[in-house]
C-alpha cells in the first residue's frame, strides 16, 4: 500500500535541515539539463524575473555540486494541503505509518518517501523541459512505475498532472478521492476545498492508522463523511454539509 501526495509551489525555507541521500541518475540528468540554460533562458522557462532566475541558476549549481540545503520533503512543502496535514508531535505509530506508507511525487526527485531530504526547487510536470527528446512525464514514467511495482493498492491524492506520469497499468490500481461541499441546493467543489480536505483527510489516515478501504468509509474528518451513493470502485467521495 502507498498513499501518494503531490509537491507544492509554496515552500517553508525555515524547515529543519537534513543530510540528503545520493541523487538518482534521473535527478542528476534533469539538473544537468537545467544547468545548460542561461539566466535569460531560465527566466523564460520558469516565467520569472532575471533577478530570480539568477538565484535559481545558483540553486541548480549548488544542487549539482552537493552544497544545497536540504529538508524533509513533508516539512519543506508548505502549500494549502500541506498546511492542513498534521506535521508535528507525532506518536511513534504515526511516524512509522508515514515512513511506511506516505510518498511524494516530484518532477525532480521522482517518487520519494515523505521524509526524504530534498532541496527547494521550482520544477513541475507542466514545464516544457526535454530530456533525450522526451517530456518530463515520459522521462520519469519508468522510474515512477518501478517505485510502485510492489504496491497492490495505491491511494492517490494527486492531480491528473501527476497521475498521468504513471502507466495505465499502475493507474488501474489507484483509488482517488473527491471532496465536496453540500450547500443545500447543490454539491460544490473547487481547489481550495479540495486542497484543505486532502490535508485533513491525510491527517485522519495517519492518526487512525488507516490501511484499508473499509476503514476509510468510516472516517469523519473536518465535517466530511463518506458518500457511497456518489462513490465508485476507483473514486471515494466525501461530502461536508455547510
Swiss-Prot record:
One of its GO terms (biological process) is response to hydroperoxide. One of its GO terms (cellular component) is cytosol. Belongs to the UPF0246 family. InterPro entries: YaaA. This is UPF0246 protein SSA_1395. Disulfide bonds: none annotated. It comes from the Bacteria.
